Amino acid sequence: MALLQIAEPGQSSAPHEHKRAAGIDLGTTNSLVASVRSGTADTLKDAQGRSLLPSIVNYANEEAIVGYEAKALSESQPQDTIISVKRLLGRSLTDIQTRYPSLPYRFKASENGLPVLQTTQGDKNPIEVSADILKVLAKRAEESLGGELSGVVITVPAYFDDAQRAGTKDAAKLAGLHVLRLLNEPTAAAIAYGLDSGQEGVIAVYDLGGGTFDISILRLSKGVFEVLATGGDSALGGDDFDHLLADFLAEQAGLETPLSAEKNRTLLNIATATKIAFSEQDSVEVEVFGWKGVVTREQFEELIRPLVKKTLMSCRRALKDADVEADEVLEVVMVGGSTRTLLVREMVGEFFGRTPLTNINPDEVVAIGAGIQADILAGNKPDSEMLLLDVIPLSLGIETMGGLVEKIIPRNTTIPVARAQEFTTFKDGQTAMSVHIVQGEREMVDDCRSLARFSLKGIPPMAAGAAHIRVTYQVDADGLLSVTAMEKSTGVQSEIQVKPSYGLSDDEVANMLRDSMTYAKEDMQARALAEQRVEADRVIEGLIAAMQADGDELLSEAEKATLLQAIESLIELRNGNEANAIEQGIKDTDKASQDFASRRMDKSIRAALAGQSIDTI
């Protein structure tokens, strides 16, 4: 007799089968892959025993060369060797050329304005370059784990926007990987740190990588990792230390600038090696194109001090957002290879008033956290052991009448999240509504970032204010936003998934937060003025419509003249810049039209009761 295997839909017939999953730290300078084996998370090494894979791809031949071999070719083939491609993800060609004018690559724009790199092998975009790095990491994982991966968790900087996150997902798809989740890098570090130490309290995760800086303030409590606030800079990292030192060396050596692409790459490699040496030495002998000299750690630290101070400004802002004082932070976790720089450790320690934790390898901690999370999401470990709460870095809102912003999801709200709010029509007979989605902290639409627009059509004609349109904002676990608008009486709805064509420029996020505080008073005054103008428009339009409908029947010529004068006065005030004056004008107009409103009400009641008997009533 045959035995039938019965299982729940979607479940494995072997429920205890361990699924192969990996966490990938797709870094600006280096990338890593980690996994949980025998209950322990660790990075997976290549055949030479190396965890790090340089995030460098060479396209000089038919096959892409990735990692250390590509790095070795970077000086001789700079235009075909793509370095720090993570900085290019989600950016327009114009933005890249403005921000990184010294890049040696041959760029051209695609039809949608996104960058294409021209190489000997052919045209490549940043997504394709990232995919080639992911393929090598995936192959390493599959060889180490003995089979095909069921899924991966890929880390991204907390400040990556929708376009940059979507680009990361697209790269993984191109590499043939199933993405279980995108995970913020500081949060991944918190997972690795939290499981290792078991501590509870407020933790600061200071993540300074090759190309990005992130600061996260987290609360660890009974297995719950809650991100209280995030901050940082999407274009500040150890690469910038290298460039400053390279410029200093070029000046010391008396080199004529601009340098050729090949010389520039050689100089950067020398600068990087010198920077690394300063972690153990006070001075380094340097040879640059025939010039020999000694560079001291003190000279290097003076060059980079302003950049380190810039990271501490982000730390201060994040603490304020989290409503936490620096002395409340129990531990400071250092993440990213650039935190090996002694000045960084020293200044961070002074800022928080405690020695930063460096016992976990700062290069590997993010990948290890991602590996742990991948193990959970693959079903190898009950997720009840850990609850992860990420946050959105900037408020998401909608434009309302008068160019005002109504915030639907405030910044630092934990994700995934869905929030809904009801809106109505402004004019009689309105059959469509335009939904304008914005991002930012300011009160007026012009001061925020426009994300997308779409229209809801098919609203039944009704009096102004009678329709009920429910607008729902939903942010998934990867930080991607979808917006739905639905008219409640008919069920007609429209939806959009927000994917900006490219990401925020370098300091835009930080500037948006800074401006919201700098201009808080002016913004509230502008909002009050706009609100009064919208209300004045409503009163003016309503009164004009009422006079056109019933003025001849219910008003004398003198009363008409009085109301027209009130309307003209209110229009004049409405076009001014005094919110209080407009508010008073609205009150005066309401008072002047009170008798007219009563007569219209009486007329409506008489019309409704006409022909009815007392018994019916």
From Swiss-Prot:
Annotated GO MF terms: ATP binding; ATP hydrolysis activity; ATP-dependent protein folding chaperone; unfolded protein binding
Keywords: ATP-binding, Chaperone, Nucleotide-binding
Biological processes annotated in GO: iron-sulfur cluster assembly
Entries under NCBIfam families matching the protein: HscA, PRK05183.1
HAMAP family linked to this entry: HscA
Sequence similarity: Belongs to the heat shock protein 70 family.
Function field: Probable chaperone. Has a low intrinsic ATPase activity which is markedly stimulated by HscB.
Protein name according to UniProt: Chaperone protein HscA homolog
